């Protein structure tokens, strides 16, 4: 396992953290009956992103290139939705959005390296 593979595993666990965060957000803000400042479809977006995050986690470990593409696509989607549809800094300093943005920047900056240098896979048969 080289440095790119180790970093890819770390990145994969970042998506698990994201999935757990999305579940926490949905529970804390009303689950299916959320009427907060975000759009009414927000809970369904979070549930969907939660599942996608887990798929990205698995693909980063099992099929590195598929995982890298999915991680970039997921971060582009999550950042666009979060920066345009949800209250950003209206209710104070939004550390969650800044953390998500930082994670997205890390994904974007490391994608070329991970694409070319990742070799290790979870299963040698994959």
Would you name each region that the model predicts?
Residues 1-126:
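Topology signature of small-to-medium multi-pass alpha-helical membrane proteins
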